[in-house]
């Protein structure tokens, strides 16, 4: 399994750019602020003098891509493409794990659920300025979630939770998760009189 996929068009683009560089120059792919919400990926030239001992080298047709050891796990499943659109051509870099490191299939349930929330659910809620934090997973199999940002106190929270988030999580973790609860509802349920 290749760690990073570079399309044929993007490879041709890199080869063309590298022709005008000093011999032995390759490319470097990196992540700035990896594992944070403001992670950003980039590509730069990598002359031979810039290759570090702990870099990983991925060989492509006519050039290599070097990745530093900190960026490496965050670039898993990344894809680089060179797309031609009406306004011209553009290099696109998609790195689904840049903001959060990919979690192993056999990792504890709470880590796997948190990964899905951070990489799939929160990006959807971000357009409303909202986000979800996983607080815990109860012994009886419920994910306890805290809604924050624009979601906090929003009357649509219940709908979002039940129809969107809970449904998605239960489908993905079939047999492991029974459902999801909002922490406010969870707290109210444990020590309230009404």
Swiss-Prot record:
Molecular-function GO term, any one: 4 iron, 4 sulfur cluster binding
A Pfam family annotated for this UniProt entry: NifU
Superkingdom, taxonomy of origin: Bacteria
Ligand binding ([4Fe-4S] cluster): 151, 154
Cross-referenced HAMAP family: Fe_S_biogen_NfuA (MF_01637)
Cited function: Involved in iron-sulfur cluster biogenesis. Binds a 4Fe-4S cluster, can transfer this cluster to apoproteins, and thereby intervenes in the maturation of Fe/S proteins. Could also act as a scaffold/chaperone for damaged Fe/S proteins.
Xref: PANTHER family: FE_S BIOGENESIS PROTEIN NFUA, IRON-SULFUR CLUSTER SCAFFOLD PROTEIN NFU-RELATED
Protein name: Fe/S biogenesis protein NfuA
Gene: nfuA
């Amino acid at each position: 399994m290749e760690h990073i996929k570079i399309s044929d068009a993007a490879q041709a683009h890199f080869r063309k750019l590298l022709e005008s560089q000093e011999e032995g120059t390759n490319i470097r792919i990196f992540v700035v602020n990896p594992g944070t919400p403001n992670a950003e990926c980039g590509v730069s030239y990598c002359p031979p003098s810039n290759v570090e001992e702990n870099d990983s080298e991925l060989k492509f047709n006519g050039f290599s891509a070097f990745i530093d050891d900190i960026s490496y796990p965050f670039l898993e499943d990344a894809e680089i493409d060179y797309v031609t659109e009406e306004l011209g051509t553009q290099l696109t870099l998609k790195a689904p794990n840049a903001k959060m490191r990919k979690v192993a299939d056999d990792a504890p349930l709470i880590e796997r659920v948190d990964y899905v929330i951070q990489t799939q659910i929160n990006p959807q809620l971000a357009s409303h300025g909202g986000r979800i934090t996983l607080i815990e997973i109860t012994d009886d199999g419920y994910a306890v979630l805290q809604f924050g940002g624009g979601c906090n106190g929003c009357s649509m929270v219940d709908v979002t939770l039940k129809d969107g988030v809970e449904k998605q999580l239960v489908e993905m973790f079939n047999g492991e998760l029974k459902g999801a609860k909002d922490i406010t509802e969870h707290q109210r349920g444990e020590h309230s009189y009404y």
